[in-house]
Amino acid sequence: MVSHQFLPYLDYIKICLASPERIRVWAQRILPNGQIVGEVTKPETINYRTLKPEMDGLFCERIFGPIKNWECHCGKYKRIKDKGIICERCGVEVTESKVRRHRMGYIELSAPVVHIWYLKGMPSYISVFLDMAAKEIEQVVYFNTYIITHSTAENKQIKYKQLLTEDEWVLIEDQIYRNEIQGEIEIGIGASAILKMLKDLDLSLESDLLRTKLVNLKAVKKDKIMKRLRIIDNFMVTGASPSWMVLNVIPVISPDLRPMVQLDGGRFATSDLNDLYRRVINRNNRLKRLEEILAPEIIIRNEKRMLQEAVDALIDNGRRGRVVVGANNRALKSLSNIIEGKQGRFRQNLLGKRVDYSGRSVIVVGPDLKLNECGIPKEMAIELFQPFLIHQIIKEGLANNMKSAKKLMQKHTSVTIELLQKIIKWHPVLLNRAPTLHRLGIQAFDPVLVDGRAIRLHPLVCPAFNADFDGDQMAVHIPLSIEAQTEARLLMLAPNNFLSPATGQPIITPSQDMVLGCYYLTNNNLANQKGSGHYFSSFEDAIIAYKQKLISLHAFIWVKFYGTINNLDIGRFIKSTLCKNKLTTTDYYENLQVKKDIEGTITCQFIKTSVGRIFFNIAISGNLFFSTSNHNK
């Protein structure tokens, strides 16, 4: 864990391979008597009689800390005044029990094992480093074939990294014994052979050789070499060694992250990780005993393979071979299962955790809202803006303390709503819809109080959130500080996010029923409509006539227009007439009638339109010029 005093000096956090020495440093502590603790050597968890953790076991208090605050294992020290003392009898440090959430242990393996992520992952890093097929390496790791790890033999049939069966190796041994093969040959099997080959790699030399090969190669082979070169360069930059992909030490995570809980009736419920760690420790201890008693090689190899499989199950259960199951044939959750996926530690508990001053509800359409507004239910707003509301109630003198202010607030009186209206007037809120795949997945809006329990959303911002109104839910967050509110208003307000950051194209565009409505209003309906051909002195007169049902929505009418007409398709010229007084002329076009005086000055003009198009023009006036043509998307 990072101490808070160092946080201001951090530039970044890097995740990389850990060396065996680093893993030991995480867990090892030196007691005043010189004893080094940290290694977990026993598979036991708790003593069934005393219900206390077993020493050197998976819940050991000496390694991970006391289970009770300020109390050691043997009970000699039980007070906070003994803080920091390490008990002479049991070796447990007198401290808070919360240290069991971050103190780690480790298991020292009797034989190296390959990390399954780097063997079975995509790409397989070990196969890329050794320039071998992943299946070939798998055969070696699980003790099915031998591999030549070093060769100076002149025989061309014997090459470095060549795979050998048991019979082939016996034949080569006979040839070496009879001096038919000159030079040294070393073979290996299991993870130890892979470890030796990775240690023998010179990364800088390999990098130089690959760069030399790239000069005169075809595209297909070049891609393969580039892939290998990129991984080698990344290891060199981070200072990681390829041999760290083979584990000699396994970290044991803190016991409070894999708890054991006592149920009613005396039974215990435990994390699956404890079972997986227990399998590793049992097999590791058994391998150690077999090596001590000089057991036959075939038995030791079988135990090493079982240890490899136990570590595989601990890291990623089911990635290779049979899934390790517990009670009721349920697959045990490994470290990978805990952190991956939607229900994993990152997405469920870190990115998706619940925070204060936030709410969640179903969204419904709010067509009467402005683009920068969203509808927040009154019940939700009172709860979310509670600190601001309590402060305002006390400031207005409606209550003397927080307790009475809370009581007044919970009554939802008209006074409370008025104060809330005043508070939210300049206080933006953040709306977020999961999954937040790009930055427009969370935007700021000015809240508007609405009845009901649903959040109202402007239909034009739906494409940015990829939202629809078939039951989608959205989260509301309240920026508390002035800095957060300012940033939300300047950078995150919906009208300020008009363009998609990915393509640069407008993302606030009308769609679906909005386009259909625009088409319906501006449609050329050729059928006989009520009131067609009537003349009106203004748009308002035409709307009044429509409301009185004197004309239909799509009837073509002539409306007097005083402004400048731009971008109007006036259609073909029909005729020009001279009035009886011979002082004015009228030019008739398909969509326009223009009256001019004797000097040619326009005195009056009528445009051909419909009430639907007038409504459409009013809706978009100030942004677009009036047009009588259909407005398709």
Curated annotation (Swiss-Prot):
Q: Supply the EC number(s).
A: 2.7.7.6
Q: Does the keyword Acetylation apply?
A: no
- Chief subcellular site? plastid
Swiss-Prot/TrEMBL GO biological process terms: DNA-templated transcription
- For Zn(2+), which residues are the binding ones? 72, 74, 87, 90
Q: Where does Mg(2+) bind?
A: 468, 470, 472
Lineage, please? Eukaryota, Rhodophyta, Bangiophyceae, Cyanidiales, Cyanidiaceae
Keywords from the named record: Chloroplast, DNA-directed RNA polymerase, Magnesium, Metal-binding, Nucleotidyltransferase, Plastid, Transcription, Transferase, Zinc
Q: Coiled coil where?
A: none
- The set of disulfide-linked cysteines is none
Which cofactor(s) are needed, names only?
Mg(2+); Zn(2+)
Instruction: Output the superkingdom of the source species.
Output: Eukaryota
Q: Which family does it belong to?
A: Belongs to the RNA polymerase beta' chain family. RpoC1 subfamily.
Q: Where is the signal peptide?
A: none
Q: Kindly report, in one word, the top-level EC class recorded for this enzyme.
A: transferase
- What does the Swiss-Prot or TrEMBL cofactor note state? Binds 1 Mg(2+) ion per subunit.
> Which protein are we looking at?
DNA-directed RNA polymerase subunit beta'
Q: Which reaction does it catalyse?
A: RNA(n) + a ribonucleoside 5'-triphosphate = RNA(n+1) + diphosphate
GO molecular function terms attached to this record: DNA binding; DNA-directed RNA polymerase activity; magnesium ion binding; zinc ion binding
Function statement: DNA-dependent RNA polymerase catalyzes the transcription of DNA into RNA using the four ribonucleoside triphosphates as substrates.
What is the protein's quaternary organization? In plastids the minimal PEP RNA polymerase catalytic core is composed of four subunits: alpha, beta, beta', and beta''. When a (nuclear-encoded) sigma factor is associated with the core the holoenzyme is formed, which can initiate transcription.
